[in-house]
Amino acid sequence: MRLVLSSLIVIAGLLSSQATAATAPEQTASADIRDSGFVYCVSGQVNTFNPQKASSGLIVDTLAAQLYDRLLDVDPYTYRLVPELAESWEVLDNGATYRFHLRRDVSFQKTAWFTPTRKLNADDVVFTFQRIFDRRHPWHNINGSSFPYFDSLQFADNVKSVRKLDNNTVEFRLTQPDASFLWHLATHYASVMSAEYAAQLSRKDRQELLDRQPVGTGPFQLSEYRAGQFIRLQRHDGFWRGKPLMPQVVVDLGSGGTGRLSKLLTGECDVLAWPAASQLTILRDDPRLRLTLRPGMNIAYLAFNTDKPPLNNPAVRHALALSINNQRLMQSIYYGTAETAASILPRASWAYDNDAKITEYNPQKSREQLKALGIENLTLHLWVPTSSQA
């Protein structure tokens, strides 16, 4: 079963900038959670403020784009790579070497815990990626050695070196060409950190705070975090693209499910992210609200453990695929907000194969194939996610 999910956001009055966060020191709480701000209601937990250390969740989906920037970005309409912190780049050695030329006008955020003394430079990029890829780097094991996204790709094994050529030029050398390399650097998992901030924490012997008290170059910076309640983001006045229009964004974590819907309907939220599909009728019928949908880059699918018999047999996996009624799932689970996918890649991906075929629903054929393989009364254990985006 593979489903391409749509991104769902309900907007009351105005559009939001997305926002995300993790653990940072508590500040004095304002009497009013709004405090002249914009309230974005979303469900999720914050375990880290560093998207490199997360596999998914609030920091990746919402906060990373507010706190940090990457070398590259992906245009949301054309799905093509576009410059971000790197204003240009070169592909050399048939795709085994990548050279990035950095912008010279990018400032890090000035927070209660850090005041930068310089602009972004090559040292920050080298520090960021050496920490991820070099297992001997002094920062690699801080807050655990796991970098889930890059670990899952065994990415470090293909990175030979990350080095500074000059103050504004960084070069990545790979062990072999990789056509997907640039696309990985455009994910939020490749957010760029401050080497100067890391050096300050090292002098204080407080290295663990790098992932808990974030400092980035993004449009908003962390101002206040109340675990399980809200995250307050303050405008980064020195943002290189220009000062954000909103002085602050509040990410409301306090309610889930119908609680978030109630907050939207009573005006406590300006935006409700990822509403449950079962709530769409209510949202569509309310003239005060605007529901926006667009194809997502995410998918839901049934992943087989191919190390375990009989799932190591492709014929068994095909027989199981024949037994799944995708169209029924589209309506009963996703209420028409998803489409059956023919590939593990979403349609919006640059690598999507338009010739990929969708497995038909044919339970009789499924039973016959399993019987021919000598399999009856097959019992499988399923692990399923519990998040609202599952």
Region roles according to the model:
Residues P25-E26, T281-L293:
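Ligand-binding "clamshell"
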Residues A29, G44-T62, L85, A112-P116, ...:
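A structural "hinge/loop" feature
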Residues D35-G44, E87, T97-H101, V125-T128, ...:
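Short, well-ordered beta-strand elements
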Residues V39-N94, Q130, H137, V215-T217:
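N-terminal lobe/hinge region of extracytoplasmic solute-binding protein
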Residues E87-W139, E171, K263:
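Aromatic- and charge-enriched surface segment that lines or borders ligand/interaction sites
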Residues H101, D124, F133-A198:
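Surface-exposed binding/hinge segments that line
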Residues D205-D211, H236-I282, L293:
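Ligand-site clamp/hinge motif
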Residues R232-R235, N312-A390:
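Append "and occasionally in soluble cytosolic enzymes with long acidic Gly/Pro-rich linkers
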